[in-house]
Amino acid sequence: MSSEYGALRSLDSPNVGSYKLSKVALNGLTRLMASAVDNNQIKVNSADPGWVHTDMGGPSAPRSPEQAAEGIVWLATLPDNGPGGKFFYDKKVIDW
């Protein structure tokens, strides 16, 4: 699981710096792994579930766990010709 904070554009602000850097590293690892398994019927992608109403996200978070899970399950069940090495939010590719 990644986050919008894993996008390089998020580094313009120092807020939650260590969290952002961990997500940037995760996104980098996603790209490396996707390249390593290319053409092996393995899909490696990164997903941002959004701000989710969980213990970590808190009661103000607008998304339910079920809403967040939709995109994650979709990625986990991509067909063989589905995308790999991408960053997704709500089943849409977003910029790294």
Where are these regions (language model features)?
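C-terminal helical subdomain
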Residues: 39, 46-49, 54, 58-96
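Structural signature of the Rossmann-like NAD(P)-dependent dehydrogenase/reductase core
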Residues: 1-3, 43-48
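Catalytic loop of short-chain dehydrogenase/reductase
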Residues: 1-39
